[in-house]
Amino acid sequence: MAEERKLYVCMRCGRTFSKSEMEILPGIRCPYCNFKIIMKVRSPMVKRIPAI
């Protein structure tokens, strides 16, 4: 199974980074500007489910 890379975006500086880059600092913070509020990027693929 291929490892899926999770991407995050900083709400202050707008840079995109991975979880491994985020682990440089203690806690959950942007590795570039040290801001606490980050957002996980959703995958561009739409998940379709059948109607009941």
UniProtKB/Swiss-Prot annotation:
A biological process from GO: DNA-templated transcription
GO CC list: cytoplasm; DNA-directed RNA polymerase complex
Reaction(s) catalysed (UniProt annotation): RNA(n) + a ribonucleoside 5'-triphosphate = RNA(n+1) + diphosphate
UniProt KW Metal-binding keyword: yes
Keyword Iron attributed: no
Entry EC number(s): 2.7.7.6
Enzyme class, spelled out: transferase
Highest taxon of source: Archaea
Cofactor note text: Binds 1 zinc ion.
Sorted UniProt keywords: Cytoplasm, DNA-directed RNA polymerase, Metal-binding, Nucleotidyltransferase, Transcription, Transferase, Zinc
Binding site for Zn(2+): C13, C30, C33
Main location: cytoplasm
Function according to Swiss-Prot or TrEMBL: DNA-dependent RNA polymerase (RNAP) catalyzes the transcription of DNA into RNA using the four ribonucleoside triphosphates as substrates.
Protein name in UniProt: DNA-directed RNA polymerase subunit Rpo12
Source organism per UniProt: Pyrobaculum calidifontis (strain DSM 21063 / JCM 11548 / VA1)
